[in-house]
Amino acid sequence: MSELCPCGSILNYHECCGPYILGTQVAAKPAILMRSRYCAYVEKNVDYLIATWHPDCHAQEWRESIIQGFTKTVWHGLTVIAETPGRHPDEAFVEFIARFTDADNAQITAMHERSRFLRIKEHWYYIDGIRPSLGRNDTCLCGSGKKHKKCCGR
């Protein structure tokens, strides 16, 4: 890959998320791990996704479900909104919006999540996330410019 990184940075893939996915570098911050996980979804790299889920999640059990999801989803972009510390130094949160098209719906949809990450030794892991609520009159996250109720919120 010699193109720009799918995570939305202005860097080449090999200078951005590639080294994390290849395992030659460790993500020093949760936002970096978030970006590399997004790239893994784009690349359909189930092994990296499973390796970066917190061990308590037992993500290996979801392998087939994750692979099945790859066949239905086309990713269109990632916006990292904020990275915030948690209650202790080994916890942090990353809020993001990921845009995608699902095979069942030709329209671009957006997923807005505040993901929680935990650190074990020097490695960060995704553990869970919450989806902030969006009002019906708020602008839709998919980027259409329409109100949520007239777009993805139908």
UniProtKB/Swiss-Prot annotation:
UniProt xrefs under InterPro entries: NTF2-like_dom_sf, SEC_C_motif, UPF0225, YchJ-like_M
PANTHER family: ADENYLATE CYCLASE-ASSOCIATED CAP C-TERMINAL DOMAIN-CONTAINING PROTEIN, UPF0225 PROTEIN SCO1677
Domain of life, per lineage: Bacteria
Similarity field: Belongs to the UPF0225 family.
Protein name: UPF0225 protein YPO2172/y2149/YP_1971
One of the Pfam families matching this protein, by short name: YchJ_M-like
Gene3D superfamilies: 3.10.450.50
